[in-house]
Curated annotation (Swiss-Prot):
This is Protein GrpE. The lineage of its organism: Bacteria, Pseudomonadati, Pseudomonadota, Gammaproteobacteria, Lysobacterales. It is found in: Cytoplasm. Participates actively in the response to hyperosmotic and heat shock by preventing the aggregation of stress-denatured proteins, in association with DnaK and GrpE. It is the nucleotide exchange factor for DnaK and may function as a thermosensor. Unfolded proteins bind initially to DnaJ; upon interaction with the DnaJ-bound protein, DnaK hydrolyzes its bound ATP, resulting in the formation of a stable complex. GrpE releases ADP from DnaK; ATP binding to DnaK triggers the release of the substrate protein, thus completing the reaction cycle. The keyword tRNA-binding does not apply. InterPro entries: GrpE (IPR000740), GrpE_coiled_coil (IPR013805), GrpE_head (IPR009012). SUPFAM superfamilies: Coiled-coil domain of nucleotide exchange factor GrpE (SSF58014), Head domain of nucleotide exchange factor GrpE (SSF51064). Keywords: Chaperone, Cytoplasm, Stress response. One of its GO terms (biological process) is protein folding. Belongs to the GrpE family. Coiled coil: none annotated. Gene3D superfamilies: 3.90.20.20, Head domain of nucleotide exchange factor GrpE.
């Protein structure tokens, strides 16, 4: 027994009065609920951050490939100008020079907008960028390398817009 306060027994202090048990249960219940709310808030925050990243990536892709349709429709124009330059030969003339200048200006504008020309003569065949239309033999070109290009290919911001149509050197 406690001598200062005989009404309190030290053994009584170690035991919980019956009315505190429901309070402890409620405190534990509230702690569990707080933990669940914190976990939900953390998940929501992570979902929001993932959504922000996804939207930023989508906006970046939309910006990078906004000109895809226009540049794709200009590819036949590039082909025609290239064919015209080939047909005009190598002799300088005002018409050929004008055609060459126009072609170079158009290619520069396209390049400034992310277009890259694929002209793979002499390079190893790459099925991700080239479409083989036949095989042939060529002096000085290793087997499996591009011998001739029938139609140039193009990349738009490193994504294939049109494969190059090529002839590949035969393997012996």
């Amino acid at each position: 027994m406690n001598q200062d306060h005989p009404e309190f027994d030290s053994e009584d202090l170690s035991q919980n009065p019956p009315e505190t048990d429901p309070l402890k249960a409620e405190i534990e219940s509230l702690r569990s609920e707080i933990a669940l709310v914190k976990a939900d808030a953390l998940r929501e925050r992570a979902d929001l951050e993932n959504q922000r990243k996804r939207i930023a990536r989508d906006v970046e892709n939309a910006r990078k490939f906004a000109n895809e349709k226009l540049l794709g429709e200009l590819l036949p124009v590039f082909d025609s100008l290239d064919a015209g330059l080939t047909a005009a030969g190598t002799e300088p003339s005002p018409l050929r020079d004008g055609l060459d200048l126009t072609y170079k200006q158009l290619l520069k504008v396209a390049a400034d907008n992310g277009l890259t020309l694929l002209d793979p003569v002499g390079q190893p065949f790459n099925p991700d960028q080239h479409q083989a239309i036949s095989q042939g033999e060529a002096e000085g070109i290793a087997p499996g390398h591009v011998v001739q290009v029938f139609q140039k290919g193009y990349l738009l911001n490193e994504r294939l817009l049109r494969p190059a149509l090529v002839v590949v050197a035969k393997h012996d």
